[in-house]
Amino acid sequence: LPYIALILVCWSVLSQAAQTDVEERADKRRPIWIMGHMVNAIAQIDEFVNLGANSIETDVSFDDNANPEYTYHGIPCDCGRSCLKWENFNDFLKGLRSATTPGNAKYQAKLILVVFDLKTGSLYDNQANEAGKKLAKNLLKHYWNNGNNGGRAYIVLSIPDLNHYPLIKGFKDQLTQDGHPELMDKVGHDFSGNDAIGDVGNAYKKAGISGHVWQSDGITNCLLRGLDRVKQAIANRDSAKGFINKVYYWTVDKRATTRDALDAGVDGVMTNYPDVITDVLNESAYKNKFRVASYEDNPWETFKK
């Protein structure tokens, strides 16, 4: 009799797991990345994830020799935020690695993607390639742990200037040179300067990039910005000949703006208040159309309805 009971329990567990798997695969809702904005201190990682973020955006400043130096934004920044929090870049990477490595005491399973907002405006155009190489070296050592059970989050390199597209090649070349070209599978790209979509496409052609493309659009929360360019980016994403895989909008702090962005069809919302976005996603008008993205959602894959 105990054997029969055990068999029944095992069968029940297996059938439940199979049902969950089928339900997840059958879930036709658009996965959404809730992107915590300006997370520049290690302590803020937990703060934003605990508020509902499944991804974060971190500012990266460079020194005169194109070395990534600090996770720092500076003044001015978004209304209602402290602009001055910072860490040494490599220290932040170590903290981030702890937060995104399964088994670590600081592990946050929900944190699946990190956008590095690369402040390359301080660099000359001819330093972009070198900045990419140095960025790759730092990430390989301090985040990816030289390819040995490092952090698992997907990484988006967000570049503000189209002329700095050589940064992408420098980054890729350095990972290849150091014996870890496979880590490019975890890396995506974004040009954040609100340039014309066609010009962004041309920059990717020059960089030799196809795929893994996120397209941002937005402005500081202190100002208003319409959704015209977001809709252009979404049209590109959804067209057969488009080069964009995902679109995100920043900085979204209000429920009404969140609803407008979701109605337009964005994949990500960058915010100072992740709990606001979570609340909207739970509203009856949205919970059947959208869900918070998990690690199983490929951030480089265009969502098909």
UniProtKB/Swiss-Prot annotation:
Record-annotated active site: H37, H73
All disulfide bonds of the chain are: C77-C83, C79-C222
A GO BP entry: killing of cells of another organism
Q: Name one GO molecular function term.
A: metal ion binding
What's the cofactor? Mg(2+)
Q: What class of enzyme is it?
A: lyase
Q: Which domain of life is it from?
A: Eukaryota
Might you give the EC number(s) for this enzyme?
A: 4.6.1.-
Tell me the cofactor note: Binds 1 Mg(2+) ion per subunit.
The stretch of residues making up the signal peptide is 1-17
In this protein, the residues bearing a glycan are: N282
Ordered alphabetically, the record's keywords are: Cytolysis, Dermonecrotic toxin, Disulfide bond, Glycoprotein, Hemolysis, Lipid degradation, Lipid metabolism, Lyase, Magnesium, Metal-binding, Secreted, Signal, Toxin, Zymogen
Which GO CC terms are listed, alphabetically? extracellular region
Coiled-coil features, chain-numbered ranges: none
Main localization is secreted
Q: In which tissues is it expressed?
A: Expressed by the venom gland.
* Family stated for the protein in its record: Belongs to the arthropod phospholipase D family. Class II subfamily.
Role played: Dermonecrotic toxins cleave the phosphodiester linkage between the phosphate and headgroup of certain phospholipids (sphingolipid and lysolipid substrates), forming an alcohol (often choline) and a cyclic phosphate. This toxin acts on sphingomyelin (SM). It may also act on ceramide phosphoethanolamine (CPE), lysophosphatidylcholine (LPC) and lysophosphatidylethanolamine (LPE), but not on lysophosphatidylserine (LPS), and lysophosphatidylglycerol (LPG). It acts by transphosphatidylation, releasing exclusively cyclic phosphate products as second products.
Name this protein carries in UniProt: Dermonecrotic toxin LiSicTox-alphaIA2aiii
